[in-house]
Amino acid sequence: MAHASEVSGQRVPNRRWAIGLLLGIGVLINYFDRINLSVAAPQMKEAFNLSPADMGLLFSAFFWPYALLQVPAGLFLDRFGVTRVGRWGAFLWGLASAITVFASGFGGVFAARAVLGIAEAPGFPVSSKATGYWFPRKERALATAIFDAAAKFSNVIGVPLVAVVVVNAGWRWGFGVTALLSFAYFIAFLVIYRDPSKDSKLSPVELDYIQKGGATPEGTSSASVFGMLGYLLTKTKVWGLTIGFAAYGYSFYLFLTWLPGYLVQTMHMSILKSAGFAAIPWAVATVTDLVVGGWLIDHLIARGKDETRVRKAVLVTGMLFGLAVFGATQTVNPVWAIFWISIALGGLAAAAPVGWSLPSLIAPKGGVGTVGGIMNFANNLMGVAAPIVTGFIVGATNSFTNAFLVAGVILAVGIVSFVFVMGPIQAIPEPTDRDEDARRATSKTSTPTG
């Protein structure tokens, strides 16, 4: 994965790839905390006498605060930096995961999941911004794919791991194990991560290679925090990215929360068997994420292909493959169902690193966290909607068919947004003093006076 590079005949060390691996491990553990509920759901449903609609609400509990805090988390990240926000976030999500162990009913589990959503809100924006700092543009796709693929790979190893723990020790231990892993990552991040300019283990040769290759400049914008937010919300490019990535998020979170339950209910599998089958689409997604969304993009750009065309081609084609979810509505055979879901998730996973690399590619200086926060806010509103809508549809129809059809329609809207609204993948100019003055004037004239 880490490949040797040279500058003026000098071999460039690979400290940046160690940081990329650290970020990937963080997302992997982060997602263990998310998927453990989907695995433990059958036991918890029985223990607390919960309906499918109740489970849909529990699945969404994480996403309400997680989504609502995305923009504040992005602003906070741009103000205080990757190092501080990353450390506090890692500590708090370990603490929040541990709280779930002691929940005693629907209300306790809902509250614990909501706290986890608060704690993990800065997670992906931190990884996106850190990747922008640490990697030149020509390596950005693979670097982004490392942490994004970790989210998919968590379902390959996390679902079976948590399933074994849940079956043998009960659902509470499923949450306890992920809490311990979260605290271990906090210690690793505390010891290892620094921004490039402050990392004593980063050689001058590699720092020069990173900076001259178009890495995102460290530092803050001259615009105020809220001035940057207001400025970015006027940009069509930001809205195109936001709508498109939200559409991706609906299908992703539907599968993340409901896939094991779909296999248990529709295909009549046990918890352990459903965990094994559910791992297959996520394994496919991990491979396409790294190979297509990561390596292939960097390879084509390095060979001189147009950057916008390459990234957009993978983005849109991946979303089109996501429409294979329609195929799963036409079968009751578990093998064919997994086949269609694997194609859908594989396509979405190939598109995802492009989406996550875009904030560091299009944002003005000091605005990466804010763009990432806006994008991930909409993405995780779908994380709220997908499990709730799916739960109510399944409860009303006793079938997942219409739930999958809804996901396909939303994907089609996202494809249109990426193609026709977002435009070229180019950096948005920094806001000027005139932009700031205009924003303030607009704010004053729109404020009622008495």
Q: In which residue ranges do the predicted regions lie?
A:
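Helix-breaking motifs and short loop linkers at transmembrane-helix boundaries and internal kinks
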Residues: N49, G81, F102-G108, A119, ...
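Helix-loop-helix hairpin linking two adjacent transmembrane segments in secondary transporters
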Residues: F147-S200
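Cytoplasmic helix-loop-helix junction between adjacent transmembrane helices
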Residues: A112-F153
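Central cavity-lining transmembrane alpha-helices of secondary-active solute carriers
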Residues: S60-L75, A279-G293
